[in-house]
Curated annotation (Swiss-Prot):
The chain crosses the membrane at residues 32-54, 65-86, 107-128, 149-169, 195-219, 249-270, 284-308. A lipid is attached at C322 (S-palmitoyl cysteine). It comes from Meriones unguiculatus (Mongolian jird). GO terms for cellular component: plasma membrane; sperm midpiece. The lineage of its organism: Eukaryota, Metazoa, Chordata, Craniata, Vertebrata. Residues 1-31, 87-106, 170-194, 271-283 are extracellular. This is Substance-P receptor. Pfam families: 7tm_1.
Amino acid sequence: MDNVLPGDSDLFPNISTNSSESNQFVQPAWQIVLWAAAYTVIVVTSVVGNVVVMWIILAHKRMRTVTNYFLVNLAFAEASMAAFNTVVNFTYAVHNEWYYGLFYCKFHNFFPIAAVFASIYSMTAVAFDRYMAIIHPLQPRLSATATKVVIFVIWVLALLLAFPQGYYSTTETMPGRVVCMIEWPEHPNRTYEKAYHICVTVLIYFLPLLVIGYAYTVVGITLWASEIPGDSSDRYHEQVSAKRKVVKMMIVVVCTFAICWLPFHVFFLLPYINPDLYVKKFIQQVYLAIMWLAMSSTMYNPIIYCCLNDRFRLGFKHAFRCCPFISAGDYEGLEMKSTRYLQTQGSVYKVSRLETTISTVVGAHEDEAEEGPKATPSSLDLTSNGSSRSNSKTMTESSSFYSNMLA
Protein backbone atom coordinates (compact mmCIF):
# COMPACT_ATOMS: atom_id res chain seq x y z
CA MET A 1 0.00 0.00 0.00
CA ASP A 2 1.31 3.39 -0.83
CA ASN A 3 -0.42 6.77 -0.65
CA VAL A 4 -3.26 5.61 1.52
CA LEU A 5 -3.21 8.85 3.44
CA PRO A 6 -1.53 12.09 2.33
CA GLY A 7 -0.05 12.07 -1.16
CA ASP A 8 3.69 12.40 -1.72
CA SER A 9 3.18 16.07 -2.41
CA ASP A 10 1.84 16.40 1.14
CA LEU A 11 4.64 14.26 2.53
CA PHE A 12 7.41 16.23 0.81
CA PRO A 13 5.91 19.70 0.35
CA ASN A 14 8.93 21.19 -1.40
CA ILE A 15 8.73 18.79 -4.36
CA SER A 16 5.36 20.16 -5.45
CA THR A 17 5.18 23.69 -4.12
CA ASN A 18 8.71 25.06 -4.48
CA SER A 19 9.74 24.74 -8.08
CA SER A 20 12.85 26.93 -7.82
CA GLU A 21 14.73 24.70 -5.41
CA SER A 22 16.72 21.65 -6.46
CA ASN A 23 15.55 18.24 -5.38
CA GLN A 24 17.03 17.69 -1.92
CA PHE A 25 15.82 14.08 -1.80
CA VAL A 26 18.21 12.75 -4.47
CA GLN A 27 20.00 9.69 -3.04
CA PRO A 28 23.44 8.26 -3.79
CA ALA A 29 23.51 5.22 -6.07
CA TRP A 30 24.47 2.76 -3.33
CA GLN A 31 21.39 3.66 -1.27
CA ILE A 32 19.13 3.23 -4.27
CA VAL A 33 20.63 -0.21 -4.97
CA LEU A 34 20.08 -1.34 -1.38
CA TRP A 35 16.49 -0.12 -1.30
CA ALA A 36 15.83 -1.67 -4.72
CA ALA A 37 17.06 -5.05 -3.46
CA ALA A 38 14.91 -4.78 -0.35
CA TYR A 39 11.77 -3.95 -2.33
CA THR A 40 12.52 -6.66 -4.90
CA VAL A 41 12.45 -9.24 -2.11
CA ILE A 42 8.93 -8.09 -1.21
CA VAL A 43 7.62 -8.24 -4.78
CA VAL A 44 9.07 -11.66 -5.61
CA THR A 45 8.20 -13.29 -2.29
CA SER A 46 4.70 -11.84 -2.13
CA VAL A 47 3.68 -12.54 -5.71
CA VAL A 48 5.14 -16.06 -5.84
CA GLY A 49 3.99 -17.01 -2.34
CA ASN A 50 0.44 -15.75 -2.71
CA VAL A 51 0.02 -17.25 -6.19
CA VAL A 52 1.10 -20.62 -4.78
CA VAL A 53 -1.41 -20.22 -1.93
CA MET A 54 -4.19 -19.58 -4.46
CA TRP A 55 -3.08 -22.61 -6.49
CA ILE A 56 -2.99 -24.89 -3.44
CA ILE A 57 -6.57 -23.97 -2.56
CA LEU A 58 -8.17 -23.73 -5.99
CA ALA A 59 -6.44 -26.74 -7.58
CA HIS A 60 -7.37 -29.16 -4.79
CA LYS A 61 -11.04 -29.86 -4.21
CA ARG A 62 -10.69 -30.68 -0.52
CA MET A 63 -9.05 -27.30 0.06
CA ARG A 64 -11.98 -25.30 -1.33
CA THR A 65 -13.56 -24.45 2.00
CA VAL A 66 -15.33 -21.36 3.28
CA THR A 67 -12.30 -20.16 5.22
CA ASN A 68 -9.92 -20.93 2.40
CA TYR A 69 -11.97 -18.91 -0.08
CA PHE A 70 -11.34 -15.90 2.15
CA LEU A 71 -7.65 -16.81 2.14
CA VAL A 72 -7.74 -16.83 -1.67
CA ASN A 73 -9.24 -13.35 -1.62
CA LEU A 74 -6.58 -12.24 0.85
CA ALA A 75 -3.81 -13.73 -1.28
CA PHE A 76 -5.19 -12.11 -4.45
CA ALA A 77 -5.34 -8.66 -2.84
CA GLU A 78 -1.83 -8.92 -1.43
CA ALA A 79 -0.26 -10.29 -4.63
CA SER A 80 -1.98 -7.58 -6.70
CA MET A 81 -0.83 -4.80 -4.42
CA ALA A 82 2.75 -6.08 -4.45
CA ALA A 83 2.76 -6.45 -8.24
CA PHE A 84 1.04 -3.21 -9.25
CA ASN A 85 2.07 -0.69 -6.61
CA THR A 86 5.28 -1.60 -4.81
CA VAL A 87 7.74 -0.92 -7.64
CA VAL A 88 5.92 2.22 -8.79
CA ASN A 89 5.77 3.64 -5.30
CA PHE A 90 9.44 2.84 -4.72
CA THR A 91 10.62 4.59 -7.89
CA TYR A 92 8.47 7.62 -7.13
CA ALA A 93 9.74 7.84 -3.55
CA VAL A 94 13.36 7.54 -4.69
CA HIS A 95 13.27 9.94 -7.68
CA ASN A 96 10.36 12.19 -6.67
CA GLU A 97 9.27 12.24 -10.30
CA TRP A 98 6.17 10.61 -11.81
CA TYR A 99 6.78 8.65 -15.02
CA TYR A 100 3.50 6.77 -15.43
CA GLY A 101 0.83 9.23 -16.60
CA LEU A 102 -2.48 10.46 -15.22
CA PHE A 103 -4.39 7.17 -15.37
CA TYR A 104 -1.82 5.27 -13.35
CA CYS A 105 -1.53 8.18 -10.94
CA LYS A 106 -5.21 7.71 -10.12
CA PHE A 107 -4.83 3.93 -9.98
CA HIS A 108 -1.70 4.26 -7.85
CA ASN A 109 -3.61 6.19 -5.19
CA PHE A 110 -6.88 4.27 -5.58
CA PHE A 111 -5.97 0.57 -5.65
CA PRO A 112 -3.88 0.25 -2.44
CA ILE A 113 -6.76 1.42 -0.26
CA ALA A 114 -9.11 -1.07 -1.92
CA ALA A 115 -6.57 -3.89 -1.66
CA VAL A 116 -5.78 -3.29 2.00
CA PHE A 117 -9.49 -3.02 2.80
CA ALA A 118 -10.13 -6.34 1.03
CA SER A 119 -7.17 -7.94 2.81
CA ILE A 120 -8.04 -6.91 6.34
CA TYR A 121 -11.74 -7.66 5.99
CA SER A 122 -10.92 -11.08 4.56
CA MET A 123 -8.95 -11.64 7.77
CA THR A 124 -11.92 -10.34 9.73
CA ALA A 125 -14.24 -12.76 7.93
CA VAL A 126 -11.90 -15.64 8.76
CA ALA A 127 -11.83 -14.55 12.41
CA PHE A 128 -15.63 -14.36 12.50
CA ASP A 129 -15.92 -17.78 10.85
CA ARG A 130 -13.52 -19.24 13.42
CA TYR A 131 -15.42 -17.60 16.25
CA MET A 132 -18.75 -19.02 15.10
CA ALA A 133 -17.31 -22.48 14.45
CA ILE A 134 -15.69 -22.81 17.87
CA ILE A 135 -17.87 -20.72 20.18
CA HIS A 136 -21.21 -21.45 18.47
CA PRO A 137 -20.62 -24.74 16.61
CA LEU A 138 -24.33 -25.54 16.16
CA GLN A 139 -25.12 -22.27 14.38
CA PRO A 140 -25.52 -22.40 10.56
CA ARG A 141 -22.32 -21.88 8.61
CA LEU A 142 -21.74 -19.85 5.46
CA SER A 143 -22.40 -21.72 2.24
CA ALA A 144 -20.08 -21.47 -0.76
CA THR A 145 -22.51 -19.08 -2.46
CA ALA A 146 -22.85 -16.90 0.64
CA THR A 147 -19.06 -16.80 0.96
CA LYS A 148 -18.71 -15.51 -2.59
CA VAL A 149 -21.38 -12.88 -1.90
CA VAL A 150 -19.46 -11.72 1.19
CA ILE A 151 -16.26 -11.45 -0.85
CA PHE A 152 -18.11 -9.46 -3.52
CA VAL A 153 -19.52 -7.08 -0.89
CA ILE A 154 -16.05 -6.64 0.61
CA TRP A 155 -14.68 -5.51 -2.75
CA VAL A 156 -17.63 -3.20 -3.43
CA LEU A 157 -17.10 -1.46 -0.09
CA ALA A 158 -13.35 -1.36 -0.72
CA LEU A 159 -13.81 0.36 -4.07
CA LEU A 160 -16.25 2.87 -2.59
CA LEU A 161 -13.84 3.76 0.21
CA ALA A 162 -10.95 4.20 -2.22
CA PHE A 163 -12.91 6.20 -4.81
CA PRO A 164 -12.36 9.73 -3.37
CA GLN A 165 -8.58 9.42 -3.34
CA GLY A 166 -8.52 8.11 -6.89
CA TYR A 167 -10.97 10.75 -8.08
CA TYR A 168 -8.97 13.70 -6.72
CA SER A 169 -5.58 12.37 -7.86
CA THR A 170 -3.92 14.31 -10.65
CA THR A 171 -0.53 14.99 -12.21
CA GLU A 172 1.11 18.39 -12.22
CA THR A 173 4.04 19.54 -14.31
CA MET A 174 6.87 21.21 -12.42
CA PRO A 175 10.05 22.68 -13.92
CA GLY A 176 11.99 19.61 -15.03
CA ARG A 177 9.60 16.96 -13.70
CA VAL A 178 6.04 15.73 -13.21
CA VAL A 179 4.49 14.87 -9.85
CA CYS A 180 1.47 12.79 -8.88
CA MET A 181 -0.58 14.46 -6.18
CA ILE A 182 -4.03 14.63 -4.62
CA GLU A 183 -5.90 17.91 -4.95
CA TRP A 184 -8.62 17.87 -2.31
CA PRO A 185 -11.43 20.44 -2.46
CA GLU A 186 -10.39 23.64 -0.77
CA HIS A 187 -11.78 24.02 2.71
CA PRO A 188 -10.58 25.81 5.86
CA ASN A 189 -8.16 23.68 7.90
CA ARG A 190 -8.22 20.92 5.24
CA THR A 191 -11.37 19.49 6.82
CA TYR A 192 -12.31 17.10 3.99
CA GLU A 193 -8.80 15.71 3.72
CA LYS A 194 -8.42 15.17 7.46
CA ALA A 195 -11.84 13.55 7.79
CA TYR A 196 -11.13 11.16 4.93
CA HIS A 197 -7.69 10.16 6.21
CA ILE A 198 -8.96 9.52 9.73
CA CYS A 199 -11.91 7.54 8.39
CA VAL A 200 -9.62 5.38 6.23
CA THR A 201 -7.25 4.73 9.12
CA VAL A 202 -10.07 3.65 11.41
CA LEU A 203 -11.77 1.46 8.80
CA ILE A 204 -8.70 -0.35 7.47
CA TYR A 205 -6.72 -0.66 10.70
CA PHE A 206 -8.15 0.08 14.12
CA LEU A 207 -11.73 -1.22 13.72
CA PRO A 208 -10.98 -4.55 12.00
CA LEU A 209 -7.97 -5.14 14.22
CA LEU A 210 -10.17 -4.63 17.28
CA VAL A 211 -12.72 -7.15 15.96
CA ILE A 212 -10.05 -9.68 15.03
CA GLY A 213 -8.30 -9.29 18.36
CA TYR A 214 -11.52 -9.83 20.30
CA ALA A 215 -12.56 -12.86 18.25
CA TYR A 216 -9.20 -14.58 18.51
CA THR A 217 -8.87 -13.76 22.20
CA VAL A 218 -12.19 -15.46 22.97
CA VAL A 219 -11.33 -18.39 20.71
CA GLY A 220 -7.88 -18.73 22.24
CA ILE A 221 -9.16 -18.65 25.81
CA THR A 222 -11.84 -21.21 24.96
CA LEU A 223 -9.36 -23.55 23.31
CA TRP A 224 -6.77 -23.20 26.05
CA ALA A 225 -9.27 -23.80 28.85
CA SER A 226 -11.05 -26.79 27.25
CA GLU A 227 -10.59 -30.15 28.98
CA ILE A 228 -12.04 -33.64 28.67
CA PRO A 229 -12.77 -35.03 32.18
CA GLY A 230 -11.31 -38.44 32.87
CA ASP A 231 -9.16 -38.51 29.75
CA SER A 232 -5.44 -38.20 30.37
CA SER A 233 -4.18 -40.21 27.40
CA ASP A 234 -1.19 -39.20 25.32
CA ARG A 235 -3.52 -38.55 22.40
CA TYR A 236 -5.47 -36.04 24.47
CA HIS A 237 -2.29 -34.19 25.33
CA GLU A 238 -1.42 -34.16 21.63
CA GLN A 239 -4.75 -32.48 20.97
CA VAL A 240 -4.05 -29.84 23.62
CA SER A 241 -0.65 -29.20 22.04
CA ALA A 242 -2.27 -28.86 18.61
CA LYS A 243 -4.79 -26.36 19.98
CA ARG A 244 -2.01 -24.28 21.44
CA LYS A 245 -0.28 -24.26 18.06
CA VAL A 246 -3.47 -22.90 16.52
CA VAL A 247 -3.63 -20.13 19.12
CA LYS A 248 0.01 -19.26 18.47
CA MET A 249 -0.69 -19.09 14.74
CA MET A 250 -3.58 -16.70 15.38
CA ILE A 251 -1.37 -14.49 17.51
CA VAL A 252 1.34 -14.50 14.84
CA VAL A 253 -1.07 -13.48 12.07
CA VAL A 254 -2.71 -10.67 14.05
CA CYS A 255 0.52 -9.32 15.54
CA THR A 256 2.29 -9.40 12.18
CA PHE A 257 -0.40 -7.27 10.58
CA ALA A 258 -0.53 -4.86 13.52
CA ILE A 259 3.25 -4.41 13.70
CA CYS A 260 3.67 -3.90 9.95
CA TRP A 261 0.95 -1.29 9.55
CA LEU A 262 1.04 0.70 12.81
CA PRO A 263 4.14 2.80 11.94
CA PHE A 264 2.66 3.54 8.50
CA HIS A 265 -0.59 4.94 9.87
CA VAL A 266 1.16 6.91 12.60
CA PHE A 267 3.57 8.35 10.04
CA PHE A 268 0.78 9.66 7.82
CA LEU A 269 -1.22 11.12 10.68
CA LEU A 270 1.72 13.11 12.07
CA PRO A 271 1.52 15.93 9.45
CA TYR A 272 -1.64 17.15 11.15
CA ILE A 273 0.28 17.44 14.42
CA ASN A 274 3.78 18.52 13.35
CA PRO A 275 3.96 19.42 9.64
CA ASP A 276 7.48 20.85 9.93
CA LEU A 277 8.83 17.35 10.51
CA TYR A 278 8.20 16.43 6.88
CA VAL A 279 10.57 18.96 5.32
CA LYS A 280 13.61 17.33 6.94
CA LYS A 281 15.94 15.51 4.55
CA PHE A 282 16.07 12.35 6.68
CA ILE A 283 12.30 11.90 6.36
CA GLN A 284 12.71 10.22 2.96
CA GLN A 285 14.71 7.37 4.49
CA VAL A 286 12.16 7.06 7.28
CA TYR A 287 9.37 6.95 4.71
CA LEU A 288 11.11 4.26 2.63
CA ALA A 289 11.69 2.13 5.73
CA ILE A 290 8.11 2.49 6.99
CA MET A 291 6.67 1.82 3.54
CA TRP A 292 8.90 -1.27 3.20
CA LEU A 293 7.64 -2.59 6.53
CA ALA A 294 4.00 -2.01 5.55
CA MET A 295 4.42 -3.55 2.10
CA SER A 296 6.29 -6.52 3.57
CA SER A 297 3.04 -7.57 5.25
CA THR A 298 1.97 -8.90 1.84
CA MET A 299 4.66 -11.60 1.90
CA TYR A 300 4.37 -13.01 5.43
CA ASN A 301 1.07 -14.91 5.26
CA PRO A 302 2.29 -17.57 2.80
CA ILE A 303 5.31 -18.12 5.04
CA ILE A 304 3.06 -18.46 8.09
CA TYR A 305 0.79 -20.95 6.30
CA CYS A 306 3.77 -23.01 5.17
CA CYS A 307 5.35 -23.11 8.62
CA LEU A 308 2.21 -23.78 10.66
CA ASN A 309 -0.08 -25.85 8.43
CA ASP A 310 0.79 -29.32 7.13
CA ARG A 311 -1.39 -29.16 4.04
CA PHE A 312 0.00 -25.85 2.86
CA ARG A 313 3.49 -27.16 3.57
CA LEU A 314 2.82 -30.15 1.33
CA GLY A 315 1.49 -27.84 -1.36
CA PHE A 316 4.53 -25.58 -1.22
CA LYS A 317 6.87 -28.58 -1.34
CA HIS A 318 5.10 -29.85 -4.43
CA ALA A 319 5.11 -26.41 -6.07
CA PHE A 320 8.86 -26.07 -5.52
CA ARG A 321 9.74 -29.75 -5.98
CA CYS A 322 12.12 -28.82 -8.82
CA CYS A 323 14.43 -27.15 -6.30
CA PRO A 324 17.26 -29.56 -5.39
CA PHE A 325 17.08 -28.84 -1.66
CA ILE A 326 13.30 -29.38 -1.32
CA SER A 327 11.72 -32.83 -1.04
CA ALA A 328 8.33 -33.23 -2.72
CA GLY A 329 6.76 -34.87 0.35
CA ASP A 330 3.50 -36.82 0.41
CA TYR A 331 1.65 -34.69 -2.14
CA GLU A 332 -1.34 -37.06 -2.14
CA GLY A 333 -1.90 -36.07 1.48
CA LEU A 334 -3.62 -32.90 0.24
CA GLU A 335 -6.53 -35.07 -0.91
CA MET A 336 -6.21 -38.38 0.92
CA LYS A 337 -6.35 -37.03 4.46
CA SER A 338 -9.91 -35.89 3.96
CA THR A 339 -10.91 -39.30 2.57
CA ARG A 340 -9.49 -41.10 5.57
CA TYR A 341 -11.26 -38.67 7.86
CA LEU A 342 -14.62 -39.29 6.19
CA GLN A 343 -14.23 -42.98 6.91
CA THR A 344 -13.45 -42.25 10.56
CA GLN A 345 -16.39 -39.88 10.78
CA GLY A 346 -18.72 -42.59 9.44
CA SER A 347 -17.75 -44.97 12.21
CA VAL A 348 -18.31 -42.32 14.86
CA TYR A 349 -21.74 -41.48 13.49
CA LYS A 350 -23.11 -44.95 14.26
CA VAL A 351 -22.06 -45.28 17.90
CA SER A 352 -24.84 -43.58 19.83
CA ARG A 353 -27.32 -40.72 19.83
CA LEU A 354 -24.90 -38.52 21.73
CA GLU A 355 -22.09 -39.24 19.33
CA THR A 356 -24.44 -38.75 16.39
CA THR A 357 -24.85 -35.16 17.56
CA ILE A 358 -21.13 -34.82 18.01
CA SER A 359 -20.27 -36.30 14.63
CA THR A 360 -22.81 -34.02 12.98
CA VAL A 361 -21.00 -31.02 14.44
CA VAL A 362 -17.67 -32.45 13.31
CA GLY A 363 -19.10 -33.25 9.89
CA ALA A 364 -20.29 -29.70 9.47
CA HIS A 365 -16.73 -28.61 10.05
CA GLU A 366 -15.01 -31.33 8.05
CA ASP A 367 -14.33 -28.89 5.26
CA GLU A 368 -12.22 -26.86 7.69
CA ALA A 369 -10.06 -29.79 8.72
CA GLU A 370 -6.87 -28.51 7.20
CA GLU A 371 -6.82 -25.48 9.49
CA GLY A 372 -7.11 -27.16 12.83
CA PRO A 373 -9.41 -25.09 15.09
CA LYS A 374 -12.51 -26.80 13.76
CA ALA A 375 -11.60 -29.85 15.81
CA THR A 376 -12.42 -27.93 18.92
CA PRO A 377 -16.23 -27.97 18.83
CA SER A 378 -16.31 -31.74 19.14
CA SER A 379 -14.13 -31.78 22.24
CA LEU A 380 -15.95 -28.83 23.78
CA ASP A 381 -19.36 -30.40 23.20
CA LEU A 382 -18.06 -33.61 24.70
CA THR A 383 -17.09 -31.80 27.86
CA SER A 384 -20.40 -30.00 28.24
CA ASN A 385 -22.38 -33.23 27.84
CA GLY A 386 -20.32 -35.04 30.48
CA SER A 387 -19.78 -38.12 28.33
CA SER A 388 -18.15 -41.30 29.56
CA ARG A 389 -14.54 -42.26 29.08
CA SER A 390 -15.45 -44.63 26.25
CA ASN A 391 -17.28 -41.93 24.36
CA SER A 392 -14.37 -39.58 24.94
CA LYS A 393 -11.97 -42.17 23.61
CA THR A 394 -14.04 -42.66 20.46
CA MET A 395 -14.19 -38.95 19.91
CA THR A 396 -10.45 -38.68 20.50
CA GLU A 397 -9.83 -41.15 17.69
CA SER A 398 -11.75 -39.07 15.17
CA SER A 399 -10.49 -35.68 16.26
CA SER A 400 -6.89 -36.87 16.38
CA PHE A 401 -6.90 -36.29 12.63
CA TYR A 402 -6.92 -32.57 13.32
CA SER A 403 -4.08 -32.87 15.78
CA ASN A 404 -1.94 -34.82 13.34
CA MET A 405 -2.42 -32.19 10.69
CA LEU A 406 -1.26 -29.39 12.97
CA ALA A 407 1.59 -31.28 14.57
